[in-house]
């Protein structure tokens, strides 16, 4: 919710994966942003079809949510996949928000968008102690 409040204004647009975590859309609606769903499909290894997304008018899109390892599909993204998504964000001046709480428990070597220096200005990554340290329900800070 706080990311939406910090980066969005009424009428801005947000790219939200389908299937995906419902809170991405809910938090965006709080600030009266418009939700644009992009489909994840097994034919594309549950990755965003960037060419399809790019065929739309993206001038009002401010945030694109991604989540890898993905829930609910369990799909994983490679560093190369994440680099393509980050490049897409930079090209269109879209903040890529990578909800990444499962990386530390589902990957042999956790992958981070922040490893790709060229795109750091257009990415934000979230992690969670509840997944990696079995702290579900704990509140810190």
PLM region descriptions:
Residues 2, 24, 85, 113:
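Aromatic/hydrophobic pocket-lining residues that form π-stacking "cages" and hydrophobic walls in ligand
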Residues 36, 40-111:
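Active-site phosphate-binding strand-loop segment of PLP-dependent enzymes
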Residues 116-141:
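Active-site PLP attachment segment
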Residues 6, 26-28, 88:
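Hydrophobic/aromatic ligand-binding patch that stacks against planar heteroaromatic rings
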Residues 12, 33, 91-95, 119-121:
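A short helix->loop->beta-strand "cap" motif at the edges of active sites that frequently abuts
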Residues 1-13:
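Phosphate-binding glycine-rich loop
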Residues 21, 68-72, 131:
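Short glycine-rich anion-binding loops that position phosphate/pyrophosphate groups of nucleotides
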């Amino acid at each position: 919710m706080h990311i939406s409040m910090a980066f969005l204004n009424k009428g801005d647009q947000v790219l939200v994966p389908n299937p995906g975590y419902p809170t991405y859309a809910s938090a965006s609606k709080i600030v009266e942003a418009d939700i644009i769903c992009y489909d994840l499909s097994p034919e594309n290894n549950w990755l965003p079809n960037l060419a399809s997304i790019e065929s739309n008018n993206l001038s009002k899109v401010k945030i694109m949510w991604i989540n890898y390892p993905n829930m609910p599909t369990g799909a994983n993204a490679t560093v190369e996949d994440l680099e393509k998504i980050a490049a897409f964000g930079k090209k269109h001046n879209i903040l890529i928000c990578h909800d990444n709480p499962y990386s530390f428990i589902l990957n042999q070597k956790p992958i981070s968008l922040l490893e790709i220096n060229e795109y750091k200005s257009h990415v934000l990554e979230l992690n969670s102690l509840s997944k990696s340290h079995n702290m579900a329900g704990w509140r810190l800070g």
